[in-house]
Amino acid sequence: MKWIGWCLLWLCFAGRVGAEGPTVKVGSKKFTESVVVGELLVHLASSSGAEVTHHKEMGGTRILWNALLSGDIDIYPEYTGTITQEILAGKGIAGLPQIRQALAEQGIGMSLPLGFNNTYAIGIKEELAVRLDIAKISDLVRHPELRFGFGNEFMERGDGWPGLRDRYGLPQREVRGLDHDLAYRGLQSGDIDAMDLYSTDAEIKHYNLR
């Protein structure tokens, strides 16, 4: 899976200055890590004297990106991999200078990487992994009967399901797009056998996933 680091995206000339000082609208996606980074932004901006509003768990990438472009929010945390694979998809952009230039052309600024990262992984329940002797992605080739439930963004990304399927020659045909939270519930209930994970998800330990 592709390495994915965090950075911050903001609308250039964002923030409003009122009688009591600047105001900043922070956005975050619908999962814990994004909300936590959003809260860090809130505390940082507040400590600088700004009046800050945090719009938590707004949704997925497109919702946050469109909100940023329209000025509904001023800043939000984003994955560098998501920027290249979704927001700037098809442009052949990879390096940070190229990413920054392409975003600047749309009036969007980007911070330096925040110094930590997250990656996609495939998760299955530990007992199923033991029974089927699955320890790595290539082992899935031997089990075409497995049912996959992936986040909708993962289903569409070039480095998501399409790239994973082609790279490993995965034969599974029962593959559906789900909300990330619903996929965890589906895995627990037995409706699906495998899902995409963020490697920092607390649910990995909670649900005893491999």
Located regions from the model:
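A ligand-binding cleft/hinge motif common to bilobed small-molecule-binding domains
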Residues: 79-99, 185-210
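Short, well-ordered beta-strand elements
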Residues: 20-33, 50-56, 144-149
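Short helix-initiation/N-cap motifs at beta->coil->alpha
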Residues: 54-66, 173-185
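N-terminal segment of the mature folded domain
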Residues: 63-116
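Hydrophobic residues within well-ordered alpha-helices
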Residues: 68, 140, 186-188
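A conserved helix-loop-strand patch within extracytoplasmic ligand-binding domains
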Residues: 96-148
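Bacterial N-terminal signal peptides
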Residues: 5-14
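Ligand-binding cleft/hinge of the Venus flytrap
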Residues: 41-49, 137-176
